[in-house]
């Protein structure tokens, strides 16, 4: 039984193909329930996000993973063949750890993927398609991800506009829980900014947008995390003083936040500082506001330079993280081999005990029949030795024929050491 990882991601497949093989949680739960009694594919976890769909499974038949992925999505296998990647055992473990740590993500070091992998495991557990061995691999991958994030800087620098704005707010204001944020426009960029700020724990988000419908759509996305208020675009200047942080991205050809408006807002705020972030091109905010005391103005170029520098730092940290993942994967595989050896040793011990019991019973029967005790004892020892040596002798001969010479020489040395140790005379002084 081997551990396999098979799938497609943003590096190997177009968005169109990724859409074809994607699963939502409800459909995936039904499919996993169907796999529960499958002879060769009943121990599996499926990770499906916008950037990847991957199947992780314990199985003896790797091709069945590709067949399953194609058939469940109605895709010709030939269409998938040129885009899927497949890893086995050590490589599969390393890949899973890299995925969980954010090292294989489109946005290097992004933290969301760990939660998505955890959710995938939880769904498979609910469907009873996760063995103890498969669960152990995933739990160790989560441990690796935690180590990577806590011991390297791979996730500590902002590399998206939304995240950068949130981090900037933390630098300017020490306590995000007291902040009121104003989103001027409710487009895609400001939606990302609003989500990051809401997750950071700001007190309130004011959405200022021309279309109330679009503002309400954004409000619904963050209302479970933060208090939300919607105002019309004509109310922007009158409410500017209420905002500690303003993020503007309108797409307008003209400025929408003027010097005099910000100056008046500062006065109403008793000159408490304001952070203004202009994500628009052309710019939304009059650049002269930067001359006002207490105003921090950042534009797209300012943020992009920070993001570029941070991404370079993440890439540097990723080198250290890759080494850590490789070491942790090796530790897990070593642990698994030791466990497998322990199971084999236990089986061999039980086999030996059974052979001993059989021969003892036979010897006692012979003694009860009046056979010579010395002959019975010699026959007992001979038969037991033959039974114990037969399977190991066969394995040693096969190893000599098929295993690498180095491995066979190592095994001979180990056995020789054991035999020499057993031949040493006992110290009778301790009796």
UniProtKB/Swiss-Prot annotation:
Active site: 50
Keywords: NADP, Oxidoreductase, Porphyrin biosynthesis
Name this polypeptide is given: Glutamyl-tRNA reductase
NCBIfam families to which the protein is assigned, alphabetical: hemA
One of the Pfam families matching this protein, by short name: GlutR_N
Residues where NADP(+) binds: 185-190
EC id: 1.2.1.70
Subunit details: Homodimer.
Job description of the protein: Catalyzes the NADPH-dependent reduction of glutamyl-tRNA(Glu) to glutamate 1-semialdehyde (GSA).
MF terms (GO), sorted A to Z: glutamyl-tRNA reductase activity; NADP binding
Keyword NADP: yes
Miscellaneous notes: During catalysis, the active site Cys acts as a nucleophile attacking the alpha-carbonyl group of tRNA-bound glutamate with the formation of a thioester intermediate between enzyme and glutamate, and the concomitant release of tRNA(Glu). The thioester intermediate is finally reduced by direct hydride transfer from NADPH, to form the product GSA.
Binding site for substrate: 49-52, 105, 110-112, 116
């Amino acid at each position: 039984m081997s551990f396999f990882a098979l799938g497609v991601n943003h590096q190997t497949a177009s968005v169109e193909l990724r859409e074809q093989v994607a699963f939502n949680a409800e459909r995936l739960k039904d499919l996993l329930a169907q796999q529960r009694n499958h002879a060769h594919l009943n121990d599996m976890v499926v990770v499906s996000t916008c950037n990847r769909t991957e199947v992780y499974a314990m199985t003896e038949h790797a091709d069945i993973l590709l067949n399953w992925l194609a058939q469940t999505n109605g895709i010709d296998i030939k269409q998938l063949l040129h885009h899927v990647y497949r890893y086995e055992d050590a490589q599969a473990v390393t890949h899973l750890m890299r995925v969980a740590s954010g090292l294989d993500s489109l946005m290097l070091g992004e933290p969301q993927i760990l939660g998505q992998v955890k959710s995938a495991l939880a769904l498979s557990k609910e469907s009873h398609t996760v063995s103890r061995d498969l669960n152990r691999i995933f739990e160790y991958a989560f441990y690796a991800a935690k180590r990577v994030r806590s011991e390297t800087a791979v996730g500590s620098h902002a590399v998206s506009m939304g995240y950068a704005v949130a981090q900037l707010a933390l630098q300017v204001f020490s306590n995000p829980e007291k902040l009121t944020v104003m989103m001027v426009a409710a487009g895609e960029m400001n939606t990302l900014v609003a989500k990051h700020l809401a997750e950071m724990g700001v007190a309130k988000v004011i959405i200022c947008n021309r279309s109330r419908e679009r503002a309400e759509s954004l409000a619904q996305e963050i209302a479970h995390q933060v208090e939300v208020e919607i105002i019309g675009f004509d109310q922007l200047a009158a409410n500017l003083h209420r905002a500690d942080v303003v993020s503007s991205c309108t797409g307008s050809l003209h400025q929408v936040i003027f010097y005099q408006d910000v100056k008046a807002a500062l006065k109403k705020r008793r000159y408490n500082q304001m952070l203004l972030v202009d994500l628009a091109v052309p710019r939304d905010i009059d650049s002269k506001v930067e001359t006002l005391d207490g105003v921090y103005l950042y534009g797209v170029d300012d943020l992009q330079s920070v993001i570029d520098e941070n991404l370079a730092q993440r890439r540097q940290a990723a080198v250290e993280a890759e080494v850590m993942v490789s070491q942790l994967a090796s530790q897990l595989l070593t642990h698994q081999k030791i466990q497998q050896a322990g199971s084999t040793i236990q089986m061999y011990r039980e086999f030996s005990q059974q052979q001993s019991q059989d021969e003892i019973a036979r010897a006692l029967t012979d003694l009860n029949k009046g056979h010579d005790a010395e002959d019975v004892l010699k026959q007992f020892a001979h038969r037991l030795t033959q039974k114990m040596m037969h399977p190991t002798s066969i394995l040693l001969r096969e190893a000599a024929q098929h295993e690498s010479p180095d491995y066979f020489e190592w095994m001979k040395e180990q056995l020789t050491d054991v035999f020499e140790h057993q031949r040493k005379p006992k110290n009778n002084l301790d009796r």
